[in-house]
Amino acid sequence: AGGIAVATMPLLRERELTYILDKAQVQFALCDKALAGELAAAQAKSPALGRTIHFNDPGPDGLEALMARQSGGFRNVIPAQDDVALIAFTSGTTGQAKGTVHFHSDVLAICDCFPRSTLKPASDDIFCGSPPLAFTFGLGGLLLFPMRFGASTLLLERCPPAELLQAVQDHRLSVIFTAPTAYRAMADLAKRYDISSLKKCVSAGEHLPAATFTAWRQASGISIIDGIGSTEMLHIFISSTGDDVRPGATGKAIPGYQAMVVDDEMRPVAPGTVGRLAVRGPTGCRYLSNLEQ
């Protein structure tokens, strides 16, 4: 419809929602009816936000009822490649959460970089995982990548390790995205489930210990594809696959990206020297109304 998407986590409360609403100047909201209270409290402090529609709402003004009353026709908007598609907010681990701005071309770029070069999905794959869609790791892995390659995705409202393994068994999942802590827990549970349909397992969001990599490979027969990504870059830009996978090592810059460790003057440092990771590629890095950045 031509709008800009700003996704939020279900765990966010009034204070965090108010900050996001004001920073992004959100004008329209879709909200789960179960979470309506926190958004309503934030809306009272956010004059830019006009209409809110709730889904999972049985009432006549709920999203489902409104959709049922609409005609089948739809007039789509054709955006330019440098039109803003979404604003993703960082987790705020280094201070106040920052809004990162991504174009329509960025959305396509992440689909044609990591999955095409490293994950290599097929149209008969079924994706699933634990990261929420408001986390760009989940947005790519559970929505954008399956759509780009004509595959399918299973979206679960809750996805602790045991339920993810149950979903693999029940739905014959072939690709999963989750965090190292989940793989560690699933390694101890895997023998209780039929996970023979699994082909690819992707990890990001935190360091993948070599012990976790080994435990999961012993339990499943699958080497975890580890990756480094960021909200600013939209998805994974360093990874490895196949014979290049080594326990404890994340990998190399994927095709389309360049990465090096530099000093404070942006000069490359010698191997083994601590520095800053500099990354360049088709995505990132635009902050929303942030002069410091």
Model-derived regions: residue spans:
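Conserved ATP/PPi-binding loop(s) of AMP-dependent carboxylate-activating enzymes
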Residues: 252-256, 267-293
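Short secondary-structure boundary segments
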Residues: 32-34, 56, 158, 180-181, ...
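Conserved pre-ATP/AMP-binding loop-to-beta segment of ANL
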Residues: 54, 59, 70-89, 96, ...
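Conserved G/P- and acidic residue-centered "switch" motifs that form tight phosphate/ATP-binding loops
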Residues: 2, 92-93, 150, 205, ...
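Conserved AMP-binding A3 loop
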Residues: 85-109, 251
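Conserved AMP-binding/adenylation subdomain of ANL enzymes
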Residues: 1, 108-126, 133-175, 189
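Structural core segment of the AMP-binding/adenylate-forming
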Residues: 3-66, 172
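Gly/Ser/Thr-rich phosphate-binding loop
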Residues: 148, 173-178, 187-246, 258
